[in-house]
């Protein structure tokens, strides 16, 4: 059955959803279109029952942008799409985080969602369309799913909110936030903004939610027409008798443990001991009661002897105990109050050869952030469907297994690391100076050395501090905090600066970063259905208090960026030259620019608009290169002294010397030395570098060419201080 429906979101933004034409062997498939951007999403969920020991939902979301969608060839030697780009990974995470909470508890079938961008108008980003398509594909399938989910992007231009702004509109927008939600609630947020207030954030979310409701209704209509019954599944759960036995055995020791304000490692050891003791106790009891014949007669009896089932219910009791402690007693695992931030310590300049560094420690979460400054040549080339750009500010996040006291694979960057690094990067980039103010390429690397919650927000704080330590003139410092939520019916508690356990056992992870004047980035994941706006409002207000507290601690360490960049950072200078002089600076085959680099030790980059950036290890090298370039592009003037190169010898006439690229002059035989010169080659050889003075400029009457008369003798007649004065020194630097 082919179905196509559309909805107009205003401003000519029409979204079309269709199903029944393509990929019909998948459990569900849809195509979503806006403008000329189209995505196809498919979903397949295994019908093989999961293992009785499985306690997680193995869902995989793949988002791929096909280069043919924009009529482009993939870059590089191999002309086909290969591993996912950072943009594709971030888009996949965006969709995964919005969909995952909507699958029913206990549904553990292997599920794969593949979203492919098959057409791109290079105006509309396809990531939010991919979220809509994925949800719609599940809705028209027989896979159990709570309700439809839609994603939109919200921008704001001149104070007016815009749904799904184009790339051109986003360039003018002070908000770029992706929102995922259902008819009733918001389940995912991620975005960046130019220091907006908490009230403005809520307003943007409400605006986006209205559009989400319309798109969800469209999905519901399509699903109703398809009318495919949802498959049944058996959620593996402990029998009631077993649950009661486990609760009786473990509730008291877990409650006693919860009220102990312990460090992470000690709590983990004691918790493991409780799990082991209770599991052995339960197994010992039922091994004596249940025989092989009992299991043959009633296979569910095997669950009483399943360590995974027992451990899973102990975990459920642990979660319940912690949540009640917070809701009933306003007490947290480490003894803090609900709004209290963990102790903070900061050290700057720890890495002697780095261009800037900071060690930011908050409780048991620690980030070492290191700054590297480079030239424009160090910028990251970005090749996507939408555009080809250069990225001059990067923040990379590394999460080694030792940071949580574990062993693990060390190698390529994982999706989580890419996602956390991107969030921290978006938070800080709003205060990074423009290229005209600070022409460096900036790379910050956050090494997570310890982790017990909110390592991405520790990276935001550490990155700000490392940049300021390295003399990067950030407009304002940025801090970040992770908020949590515990909610049971109408009773709830919002937690500031959550621990790893509070994130794992809680209902929300809401990261907010910003300056004193407003929010610069946020990310929210919800594990429950039904987040009320008044809870969101409280979380935002509480996050502001925590953010300002952390900023106070940061400014105690360093209030303003250092006045100079790090000792070992390259020194950059820029000059502007006429566009028609670019060729003169570069020279034939790059000969001139290479020569300047060899002689001065400076690296030179020339942009198409005539901006010349000089990078050098010291100021003297840069100054020499600048003076050389200025001389190269200047017009020859009588009296100017040049360091030239002998190009040709005429024994009875003199020597032709190149004083500027493609500009030669004649040193007449009479201007070579004070004494009489009989043979030019006795004094000069081809290729010699000699200092000459321009003594005359005239136009040849017959050819019309400009002739330059040069003299070596004129410099010999000059006093030493004149011959080595500013103009002569200028040429020595060439």
Swiss-Prot record:
KH domain segment(s): 570-629
Enzyme class (EC, first level): transferase
Positions that bind Mg(2+): 503, 509
The protein's required cofactors: Mg(2+)
Major localisation: cytoplasm
Alphabetized GO MF terms: 3'-5'-RNA exonuclease activity; magnesium ion binding; polyribonucleotide nucleotidyltransferase activity; RNA binding
One GO biological process term: RNA processing
Family matches, as InterPro entries: ExoRNase_PH_dom1, ExoRNase_PH_dom2, ExoRNase_PH_dom2_sf, KH_dom, KH_dom_type_1, KH_dom_type_1_sf, NA-bd_OB-fold, PNPase
SMART domains named in the record: KH, S1
Cytoplasm is among the record's keywords: yes
Catalytic activity reported: RNA(n+1) + phosphate = RNA(n) + a ribonucleoside 5'-diphosphate
Any Gene Ontology CC annotation: cytosol
Compartments, record wording: Cytoplasm
CDD domains: KH-I_PNPase, RNase_PH_PNPase_1, RNase_PH_PNPase_2, S1_PNPase
S1 motif domain ranges (all copies): 639-713
Domain of life of the source: Bacteria
Role of this protein: Involved in mRNA degradation. Catalyzes the phosphorolysis of single-stranded polyribonucleotides processively in the 3'- to 5'-direction.
Matches recorded under PANTHER family: POLYRIBONUCLEOTIDE NUCLEOTIDYLTRANSFERASE (PTHR11252), POLYRIBONUCLEOTIDE NUCLEOTIDYLTRANSFERASE 1, MITOCHONDRIAL (PTHR11252:SF0)
Protein name as catalogued: Polyribonucleotide nucleotidyltransferase
Natural source organism: Chlorobium phaeobacteroides (strain BS1)
């Amino acid at each position: 059955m082919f179905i196509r429906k559309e909805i107009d979101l205003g401003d000519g933004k029409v979204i079309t959803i269709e199903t029944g034409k393509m990929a019909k062997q998948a459990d569900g498939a849809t195509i979503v279109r806006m403008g000329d951007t189209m995505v196809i999403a498919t979903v397949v969920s295994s019908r093989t029952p999961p293992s009785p020991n499985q306690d997680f939902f193995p869902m995989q979301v793949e988002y791929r942008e096909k280069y043919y969608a924009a009529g482009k060839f993939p870059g590089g030697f191999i002309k086909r799409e290969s591993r996912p780009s950072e943009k594709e990974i971030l888009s996949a995470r965006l969709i995964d985080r919005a969909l995952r909470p909507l699958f029913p508890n206990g549904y553990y079938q292997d599920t794969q969602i593949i979203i492919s961008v098959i057409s791109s108008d290079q105006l509309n980003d396809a990531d939010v369309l991919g979220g809509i398509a994925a949800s719609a594909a599940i809705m028209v399938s027989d896979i159990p799913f709570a309700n439809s989910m839609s994603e939109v992007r919200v921008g704001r231009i001149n104070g007016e909110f815009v749904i799904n702004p184009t790339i051109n509109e986003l360039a003018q927008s002070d908000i770029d936030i992706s929102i995922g939600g259902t008819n009733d609630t918001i389940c995912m947020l991620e975005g960046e903004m130019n220091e907006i207030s908490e009230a403005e954030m809520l307003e943007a979310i409400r605006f986006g939610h209205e559009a989400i409701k319309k798109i969800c209704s469209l999905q519901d209509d399509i699903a109703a027409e398809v009318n495919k019954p949802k498959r049944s599944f058996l959620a593996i759960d402990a029998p009631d008798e077993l649950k009661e036995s486990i609760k009786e055995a473990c509730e008291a020791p877990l409650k006693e443990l919860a009220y102990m304000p312990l460090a992470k490692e000690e709590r983990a050891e004691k918790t493991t001991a409780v799990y082991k003791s209770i599991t052995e106790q339960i197994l010992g009891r039922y091994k004596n009661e249940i025989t092989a014949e009992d299991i043959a007669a009633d296979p569910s009896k095997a669950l009483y002897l399943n360590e995974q089932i027992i451990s899973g219910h102990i975990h459920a009791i642990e979660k319940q105990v912690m949540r009640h402690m917070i809701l009933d007693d306003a007490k947290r695992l480490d003894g803090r109050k609900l709004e209290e931030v963990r102790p903070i310590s900061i050290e700057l300049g720890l890495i002697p050869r780095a261009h800037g560094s900071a060690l930011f420690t908050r409780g048991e979460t620690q980030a070492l952030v290191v700054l590297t400054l480079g030239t424009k040549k160090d910028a990251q080339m970005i090749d996507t469907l939408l555009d080809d750009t250069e990225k001059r500010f990067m923040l990379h996040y590394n999460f080694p297994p030792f940071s949580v006291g574990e062993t693990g694979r060390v190698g390529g960057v994982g999706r989580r690391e890419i996602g956390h690094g991107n969030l921290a990067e978006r938070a800080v980039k709003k205060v990074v100076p423009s290229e005209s103010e600070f022409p460096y390429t900036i790379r910050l690397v956050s090494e997570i050395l310890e982790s017990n919650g909110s390592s991405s927000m520790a990276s935001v704080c550490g990155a700000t501090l490392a940049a300021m330590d390295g003399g990067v003139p950030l407009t304002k410092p940025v801090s970040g905090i992770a908020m949590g939520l515990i909610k049971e019916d109408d009773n709830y508690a919002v937690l500031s600066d959550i621990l790893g356990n509070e994130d794992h056992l809680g209902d929300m992870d809401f990261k907010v970063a910003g300056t004193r004047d407003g929010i610069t980035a946020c990310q929210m994941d919800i594990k429950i259905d039904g987040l009320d706006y008044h809870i969101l409002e409280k979380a935002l207000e509480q996050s502001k208090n925590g953010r300002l507290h952390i900023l106070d601690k940061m400014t105690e360490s360093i209030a303003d960026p250092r006045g100079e960049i790090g000792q070992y950072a390259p020194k950059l200078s820029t000059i502007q030259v006429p566009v028609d002089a670019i060729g003169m600076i570069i020279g034939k085959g790059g000969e001139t620019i290479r020569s300047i680099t060899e002689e001065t030790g400076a690296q030179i980059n020339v942009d198409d608009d005539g901006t010349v950036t000089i990078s050098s290890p010291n100021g003297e090298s840069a100054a020499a290169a600048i003076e050389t370039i200025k001389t190269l592009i200047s017009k020859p003037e009588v009296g100017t002294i040049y360091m030239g190169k002998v190009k040709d010898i005429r024994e009875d006439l003199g020597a032709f010397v190149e004083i500027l690229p493609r500009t030669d002059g004649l040193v007449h035989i009479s201007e070579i030395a004070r004494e009489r010169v009989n043979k030019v080659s006795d004094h000069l050889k081809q290729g010699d570098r000699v200092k000459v003075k321009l003594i005359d400029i005239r136009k040849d009457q017959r050819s019309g060419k400009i002739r330059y008369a040069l003299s070596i003798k004129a410099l010999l007649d000059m006093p030493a201080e004149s011959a080595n004065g500013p103009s002569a020194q200028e040429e020595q630097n060439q």
